[in-house]
Amino acid sequence: MEIGLTHYLTVGAILFGLGAFGILMNRRNVIVLLMAIELMLLAVNINLVAFSVFLNDLTGQVFTLFILTVAAAEAAIGLAILVVYFRNRGTIAVEDINMMKG
């Protein structure tokens, strides 16, 4: 049995669905929201690499490297902001962060 394009696309769709489900179902913890967004980006990367290999084109793999770089920077900056916010406020609940809109 050979693993084809549909298998990779199915895994990508499942991961994307889990990430979307995590965003929709969890409205309290910011760290879980960040992890769900990262899971969705991982699903997009899997799809890009799968199409890149299927079409014998390196463009998808190059985009994946850029997305991974941006996602790593996003996660680092997001977690740093959360650490500073937690030190100042003592909580990272989404409801308390929404109070900042003022």
Swiss-Prot record:
Keyword terms of this UniProt record: Cell inner membrane, Cell membrane, Membrane, NAD, Quinone, Translocase, Transmembrane, Transmembrane helix, Transport, Ubiquinone
Reaction it catalyzes: a quinone + NADH + 5 H(+)(in) = a quinol + NAD(+) + 4 H(+)(out)
Coiled-coil stretches: none
Enzyme class name: translocase
EC number: 7.1.1.-
InterPro entries given in the database record: NADH_UbQ_OxRdtase_chain4L/K, NUOK/Mnh_C1-like
Gene Ontology CC entries for this record: NADH dehydrogenase complex; plasma membrane
Parts of the chain that traverse the membrane: 3-23, 31-51, 66-86
One function term, GO molecular function aspect: NADH:ubiquinone reductase (non-electrogenic) activity
Protein's membrane topology: Multi-pass membrane protein
Compartment(s): Cell inner membrane
Gene Ontology BP annotations: ATP synthesis coupled electron transport
Quaternary organization: NDH-1 is composed of 14 different subunits. Subunits NuoA, H, J, K, L, M, N constitute the membrane sector of the complex.
HAMAP family from the UniProt entry: NDH1_NuoK
Function statement: NDH-1 shuttles electrons from NADH, via FMN and iron-sulfur (Fe-S) centers, to quinones in the respiratory chain. The immediate electron acceptor for the enzyme in this species is believed to be ubiquinone. Couples the redox reaction to proton translocation (for every two electrons transferred, four hydrogen ions are translocated across the cytoplasmic membrane), and thus conserves the redox energy in a proton gradient.
Family per record: Belongs to the complex I subunit 4L family.
Protein name as it appears in the record: NADH-quinone oxidoreductase subunit K
Organism (species): Rhodospirillum centenum (strain ATCC 51521 / SW)
Gene responsible for this protein: nuoK
